[in-house]
From Swiss-Prot:
Superkingdom as given in the UniProt entry: Bacteria
Keyword Amino-acid biosynthesis among record annotations: no
Entry keyword Hydrolase: yes
Organism encoding this protein: Arthrobacter sp. (strain KM)
Assembly information from the UniProt record: Homodimer.
Localization: Cytoplasm
GO CC list: cytoplasm
Activity vs pH: Optimum pH is 7-8.
This protein's UniProt keywords: Cytoplasm, Hydrolase
Protein name (record): NADP phosphatase 1
EC code: 3.1.3.-
Length: 29
């Protein structure tokens, strides 16, 4: 993969991880 492809994949994954983390925080709170 090119660096741009890897970066695009990471940008797509990170928001999903952040949403999951926010959901976990809401459950814990």
């Amino acid at each position: 993969k090119s660096a741009a492809e890897v970066q695009n994949t990471q940008q797509a994954i990170i928001p999903a991880q952040e949403k999951a983390n926010l959901g976990n925080q809401n459950i814990m709170a």
